[in-house]
Amino acid sequence: MEVILLERIGRLGQMGDTVKVKDGYARNFLLPQGKALRANEANKKKFEGQRAQLEAQNLERKNEAQAVADKLNGESFIVVRSAGETGQLYGSVSTRDIAEIITANGFTLHRNQVELNHPIKTIGLHEVSVSLHPEVQVKVMVNIARSTEEAERQAKGEDLTSIEAIYGIEEQPLSEEVFDDEDEAEDQA
């Protein structure tokens, strides 16, 4: 199905472009969300008549998104989750979790604006991209930890998945004596 885009859509086109998309994508997403019109003569004339107004609305939304981006860019958010000793989470942190944390801190954000290739499954500092507008993207830091104290330690740069951090002992390489003792025990057996 051919549609006329009413706003910029990533990997598809700019406002005013006539593009061919799959019928389901147009019917279930683009048309109901008001992001496109069916490409017929009546809609083309309607779009050309409203083009200046649509461009002004798009510029206004972009400026609002840029104002939020200036506040949000580089911010760090703490997510507390249960995890094993090695740093593997019991579960994962998804786009919904990140959007809820950011929203709880006073920003308006939907989960589809958080760009995450796959759920986060380990503790640590993770950089996440947030798309506030098709032309405005920011990076935020998500600090996933077992507790707020641990999150503060991670923020300072401490590695909490090392043996020293887990057990409180220094990680030391095995000396050759250990291997020699094992070899002697095997020879005697």
UniProtKB/Swiss-Prot annotation:
GO cellular component: ribonucleoprotein complex; ribosome
Pfam entry (one): Ribosomal_L9_C
GO biological process terms, semicolon-separated: translation
Entry keywords, A to Z: Ribonucleoprotein, Ribosomal protein, RNA-binding, rRNA-binding
GO terms of molecular function: rRNA binding; structural constituent of ribosome
Primary role: Binds to the 23S rRNA.
Family affiliation: Belongs to the bacterial ribosomal protein bL9 family.
HAMAP family linked: Ribosomal_bL9 (MF_00503)
Entries under PANTHER family matching the protein: 50S RIBOSOMAL PROTEIN L9 (PTHR21368)
The protein's name in its UniProt record: Large ribosomal subunit protein bL9
